[in-house]
Amino acid sequence: MADYNTLYQQGLYLSPDQQDLLLAALSSNNPTQKQQTVTHNSEANQNLNHTPGHASSGSFSVSPPSGLDGSVNQSTTFGYEDSPYLDLNPDFDLDFLGNESLIGDLPPSLPSTEDYEPGDKRKDIDGQVNDKEDSGKKRRESDEKAAKKPGRKPLTSEPTSKRKAQNRAAQRAFRERKEKHLKDLEAKVEELQKASDNANQENGLLRAQVERLQLELKEYRKRLSWVTSTSGLSPVNAIPGAYSKGMYGLNNNEFMFDFPKFGDLPGSHLFTNTQTSKSNQNKAKDNPTATPRSEAQVPGVLNRNDLKISSPNGLSNGPSPAKSTPSGQTPNSQTSTRPGSGTLNGAVDNNGAARGYQVNSSYSASTKQATHDTPSSDSPSSSSDSHQSQLLSSNGTSPEPSLHSPAVKATESSTPHACTYTTINGEESFCAQLSMACGNINNPIPAVRQNSESASNTPSHANSSDKALGLDFFAQQNGGQFDPVLFGDWREPQDAILSQDFGTFFDDAFPLPDLGSPSHNFSEATKQPAAPKKDLIAEIDSKLDEDEEVVPGEDKSQMLTCNKIWDRLQSMEKFRNGEIDVDNLCSELRTKARCSEGGVVVNQKDVEDIMGRVK
């Protein structure tokens, strides 16, 4: 058997055509058919292409000399019996070649096509290696290893598949990095959003607190103005230097003086009574026409005699300031002094008393009387100058206190704040009188209220011989006029915490429990339906947007200034004919006046109402 295999390997040789056929057979799916085709083709080709010098296994059955090698043919000493193939059984050879088709597929242990490699590596007759055979062998090996199904399959070891795998790995890593980056950004956005929400909330709280403080500040200012306007005598009234010289002496600048401090006021009458008597004599000469009217009694008069009745020293109606002077004035001088000092008109004396006693209302009546006559001018000529200048200028429109001008003026016999509206300065005089409803920076209390309050604080109003005023304290406080400003018209109709509307404030702040108590039922029965609450924040914003506040809650476009009111007054025919009581009209306008940064203003509706009554 071994000899047969060796002989078979030595005698097997395939030409290029045979190799092509062999490759075609190997590519088929049936390995049995491949081996049969190779066997039959090799036998046919060896028989057809048999050449001398080549031995083939098929030549043994035909004729022994055809299968011998060249060396065997050359030696004539060997016969058929000496042939090296004598041990070979021809039957075995034929049976072996046919066994493949009889048995079927060869087992894996049998020699495969790889066993033919030594024969394939033999050189050609020309001594050259067949490259085509080697390339075919490589293709055959690759086909047998991988091809279990028809067609070629891509190899994972190729560079293209490696690049694809690398690309997939890179894309996967990029997606992971991108997702991680997005998560980090989302976390940072959430943190920033939380910080922004916290900052916005804190800013909102601070803004609300600032607005609440601003609202409280406004309410405190309103309350301060309300308290100072309704109190009897504020500490500002006790300081004579608090009056504004620029406001209370429009055309009488020559009568501006500096006076002692507040602590020097009680004893000032000890040194100035002589000057008082001299000035009273000069006033008696300058005003001889005031004597017939001095004895007249008009409703609302506060004469000097009334002041003397209330004197704690028990003085009668007859004594005059001359009795307290060390120079010993005669009774004639007393009677001549009376027309100038104790004036006639009730409203005028009310003003005079206010001017004389507003500074020192806490002292005795004698001290007040001395204080009233004390602050006079330094010379008799100045008193006459005062009389002349007040006839030509707006004396009463700017109510000077007795500390800034001669004590009692002859021109005050007409009205409390008399004005000369027929002169060139008529408009200025009217505006000055109307502006008395407002104060200034140095003295925030309006001059009209100041004078009326100081007049009501005098001890003579209860013992006055005039019975028209009666014992009405509130009428005395406001100069006999009802002023609705004192009772809350100036306030805004808002449900503020610090508003002066204490009824609604306590009802809202301290609601009674619903226990069925009689007081609770009564409060609910008497309680009016509550107005809808306003948006305080919106109101505060609207107030902050306003450049100039005329008065809280008032429309600036509906407010008329003094000049516009004067123009309307001049357009009236009764005013040109002198048929209108301008002083009364001015006092009515003062009750409706409001204070603003630009000066006193009056609501257009109030102006039309007052002027309509005059017409």
UniProtKB/Swiss-Prot annotation:
Residue ranges for the region (n-CRD) are 289-301
Q: How is it modified after translation?
A: Depending on the oxidative stress inducing agent, yap1 can undergo two distinct conformational changes, both involving disulfide bond formation, and both masking the nuclear export signal, thus abolishing nuclear export.
What CDD domains does its record include?
bZIP_YAP
What cystine linkages occur within this chain?
Answer: C562-C586, C562-C595, C586-C595
Comp. bias (Polar residues): 27-50, 270-294, 322-344, 358-369
Q: Where is this region: Transcription activation 2?
A: 409-508
Q: Where is this region: Transcription activation 1?
A: 214-364
Question: Which family is this sequence assigned to?
Answer: Belongs to the bZIP family. YAP subfamily.
> What name does the UniProt record give this protein?
AP-1-like transcription factor yap1
Q: Source species, please? A: Aspergillus fumigatus (strain ATCC MYA-4609 / CBS 101355 / FGSC A1100 / Af293) (Neosartorya fumigata)
Source lineage: Eukaryota, Fungi, Dikarya, Ascomycota, Pezizomycotina
